[in-house]
Amino acid sequence: RVRTLLLTPYGLRTLSPADANYRSLYEGSPEERDSAYHQGTVWPWLLGAYGDTLLFALWDRPAAARHLLGTITPLCTAHLREYGVGSVAEIFDAAPPYRPNGAVAQAWSVAELLRVLKKMRRAAPGVYRRWEAHLREETM
């Protein structure tokens, strides 16, 4: 259910779209933004815990790595080039096109992304190398 309700290419939603309190967009007045902050907003740093769980729960580590790396490709390509310029935003809207918001550069988002990428590289080096080569092709 996490994969279908919470996972996005930019992180995990803080609330399921099925919940009555879900807010898909982080916008409006400061009060409106504050009320949306934990009501569906996507947090990139949660990808670390998600990746840890995949590796723990699945026997097939290459499949876990393929799933996570394939999911987060937009975060590791277009977002890093176009918005964060080498960094990761604090939060994203919970609905496509997953507009970045909050702080332009969030240290714990960057740290968790780097940590889980390193963990995936160790768990499935072949999968990681192919994904990395794909990223290089995309940026050319």
PLM regions with names:
Residues A49-F56, R115-K119:
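Short glycine/serine- and small hydrophobic-enriched flexible loop segments
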